[in-house]
Design a protein with these regions (language model features):
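N-terminal subdomain of nucleotide-sugar transferases
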Residues: 1-27
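C-terminal amphipathic helix plus adjacent low-complexity
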Residues: 318, 323-386
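Conserved catalytic-core segment of nucleotide-activated headgroup transferases in glycan assembly
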Residues: 2, 6, 16-17, 144, ...
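A short, active-site helix/loop in glycosyltransferases that binds the activated sugar's phosphate group
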Residues: 69-70, 115-150, 223
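Short hydrophobic beta-strand element within catalytic cores of glycosyltransferases
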Residues: 265-268, 275-279
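Acidic donor-binding loop of glycosyltransferase active sites
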Residues: 56-57, 129, 247-261, 274
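Acceptor-binding helix/loop patch of EC 2.4 sugar-transfer enzymes
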Residues: 83-115, 172, 182
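Conserved acidic donor-binding segment of nucleotide-sugar-dependent glycosyltransferases
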Residues: 293-301, 309-314
Length: 386
């Protein structure tokens, strides 16, 4: 979201960030970057008054559930506003993969067609004028599996411009293994379980002096119970400085068995000059045709072997670090895609009616969804008054 805010500000847009969520001590100070914040309420006509008065040129929905809640109100009150959906990742892809892992069955893309979440998510994509997709693989899924018109999609990955290669620690200055990820995110919890039960015991047998450091916000009791100082498996909880944690580690381990989108931890490891060992799910959408900054292994025996090799062999480690820099420079620098995005926005603003006419299914869905959601929302609003 901060990346998008910066892009719009670069084009001269004033930004208003409206949210129904409660702020926490860890919320980003948007006012420090000249963003106006507004508290909004679910299922309330007060949003209609707010959006009418604001009369925005562009409305960006942060994930499809927000579009479900507020999209029809934007449609009714600001019909000429360009509606953009920031998908972050395809929730249906992540959840369908998760379900396959839990059932111990192979995942097939056709499984998505039976997903209720996919139906909601794709409906949201169709209702919006443009959907931002951060993974090339997900662009392919939307176009080939769901037959979404490419004109409704725009590839806009995470950007990583700051690589201070000369200021990074070298092989001998770094130590230990690290994993980092929010524990409210199920793929992260599953990955830590795999580390604890299947991967770390064997790595520790071969590298008894190494420690496995686990960082992540919102660790539940079941996560904290995995902490074992004797086994050198350390649960730290939230990292005060995530970049510092990754910079100091010799290797990042990410045995992701399911997920979607781009794994920020792996891109941040590249930026920090820290090689990684992950799975094909972890590397998805990141490496393209470039060599990984370490190893990609789905088989855990091979995963363990490559983690030990990377930890011990300086030449392989150095080459892996360089591979990560190459991936970031050639695939994730902002100047590779930010102007394309801004040009696309300007084009759509100038050709909005024609663009919408070419998306008849989207207009049909918007019409009927607006009616059904509207009356459900009004029923909730009236119920709350009682």
């Amino acid at each position: 979201m901060l990346q998008l805010i910066a892009l719009f500000q670069k084009k001269g847009f004033a930004i208003v960030f409206a949210s129904a969520a409660q702020e926490s001590d860890f919320s980003y100070d948007l006012k420090s970057i000249n963003v106006v914040t507004k508290k909004i309420v679910l299922n309330s006509n007060s949003f209609n008054d707010f959006i009418n008065e604001l009369n925005p040129e562009i409305v960006l929905f942060d994930r499809f559930v927000i579009e479900e809640q507020f999209g029809w109100r934007v449609y009714e009150n600001c019909p000429n506003a360009l509606r953009i959906l920031d998908t972050e990742d395809l929730h249906s892809l992540r959840l369908t993969r998760q379900n396959a892992v839990k059932k111990n069955i192979a995942f097939e893309l056709s499984d998505l067609l039976a997903s209720d979440i996919a139906k909601r998510e794709i409906a949201s994509v169709l209702r919006c004028d443009l959907s931002l997709i951060i993974s090339e693989f997900e662009i392919k899924v939307l176009a080939e599996t769901f037959k979404i018109d490419p004109n409704l999609l725009h590839y806009l990955p995470l950007s990583y411009d700051f690589i201070l290669e000369n200021e990074l620690l070298d092989f001998h200055q770094k130590k230990d293994f690290v994993f980092i990820g929010n524990f409210l995110h199920e793929p992260n919890w599953d990955a830590v379980k795999q580390l604890k039960e299947k991967i770390w015991p064997e790595i520790r047998n071969q590298l008894p002096d190494a420690t496995m450091h686990i960082y992540g916000a919102y660790p539940s009791q079941k996560v904290l119970q995995l902490h074992n100082k004797k086994e050198k498996f350390i649960i730290h909880g939230r990292a005060k400085n995530a970049n510092e944690v990754i910079v100091n580690a010799k290797i990042l381990l990410a045995p992701m068995r399911f997920g979607a989108g781009l794994k920020g931890k792996l891109l941040e490891a590249m930026q920090a000059g820290t090689p990684s060992v992950t799975t094909n799910i972890g590397a998805e959408g990141i490496k393209g045709n470039y060599n990984w900054n370490g190893f990609v292994e789905d088989d855990f025996l091979a995963f363990i072997s490559k983690a030990v090799l990377l930890y011990c062999e300086e030449a392989i480690w150095n080459e892996s670090q360089k591979n990560g820099f190459e991936i970031l420079k050639n695939r994730f620098k902002s100047d590779l895609f930010e102007n394309l995005f801004l040009d696309r926005v300007c084009f759509l603003q100038s050709n909005l009616e024609n663009h919408r006419n070419l998306n008849f299914m989207g207009r049909l869905l918007l019409h009927h969804t607006a009616l059904s959601t509207k009356y459900m929302s009004r029923w909730i609003e009236e119920k709350n008054r009682l």
